[in-house]
């Protein structure tokens, strides 16, 4: 145990022990050291000394009373201080050997306690120091005194309890939000003054609670009104949102309808442009057409009253050996070969190089191969293109339309007439208008073929016709060169004016085939051939290529 511990009994014990050790004499009563009288606690506690005086104030300065409670004094004090302390005390009290009195009898006027462990010198020395322990003890005593003054039979009010649970008020909380005081509140008869003070406090608290309750009730009512207003505004906004959504859906449907109509109109316009005669050979057809072959239709009989110079197609169909539609390209405004009027019984045809001067001379043929003789008295050039009988201006073109009727009558230019007269050949426009023929382009072999009849009985006059046709062939060759040159000049004139004609387009497309004069059968991709397709008037034409 430390010597500086406050729980150590007292300093007098050490003094007595020191005196005994110095004198060498022992007292018999000190033999019972196991139970010294100094440790016996008096029945009166130390704290009751403060309340011995009836006029004592609980809130007084208890901290300054260092005689009762003070900080511990160090045990190893100076010997001089002890000597001074011995001089102040009577000499009889210090003579332990002569007296039989028990230890501690010299302080009979003062209560002995474990807390009173300091000497008088220590108390006087630290008298000016405020004791924090004493101050804390004084506060505890004051609170205890207040609790003892309040004399109620039931539970005492504690600061931690809310006012609504205080037994003194006996308040009951009703469902409507109001408080009412129980009338059965009972108090002791000997505490009327305290009851009056408490009732005043409770009444003021009750009024305050009523005021707070009223203010809260007003807030609740205002919040309810605000909630109703917000609910109405929410319904209004939701209604507007629904209307906007409906309008958006209707607008979207209208937009889809307009877009569909626009796409349909664009498709109709595209088909109309593709079907127009001005775009027949210039644009690529996007729409599909019905498939047909040359065996789809029966052969029409040739009328006896027809023109003997007209050679119909063998099968009456312009498609030639095609299972995927038309692969032939009709040549528009192709000048026919010059023919000499002979005996109707003896008519022989030959295929010669044709002129592609589309601006000067053209032929006309219908879809069935039978042509009609038309004469135009007008001096200006007339080019008319009429669709096949199975077509209309607004219908889709069929794949059977390999040839288109073209009628062109124009007077011969004076310059070309003079040139032909100088070369010794003269072909009148009437002669061109009276002769008609059917031509189609064989895309497989890259050749231009004129369909004509061939009579075996005319073989006797073959030599005469061969000589005559040779002269006509030479004249047509010169005519072809002239037509190409004239078309080339006209194409330059149209190029300056940024205008293109059908003749210039066909010349650019078929120019290499016409200008080629190579008769080598090995190079068939760049050569234009002239063949004759024999056909008996009374028999059905059978193509040998279909027999494969």
UniProtKB/Swiss-Prot annotation:
Keyword Cell cycle among UniProt keywords: yes
Biased segments, Acidic residues type: 79-91
Subcellular location: Nucleus
Span list, region Disordered: 67-109, 184-206, 358-428
Record note on quaternary structure: May be a homo- or heterodimer.
Function: Has a role in localizing bicoid mRNA at the anterior margin of the oocyte during oogenesis, and a poorly characterized role in nuclear divisions in early embryogenesis.
Identification of the protein by name: Protein swallow
Species of provenance: Drosophila melanogaster (Fruit fly)
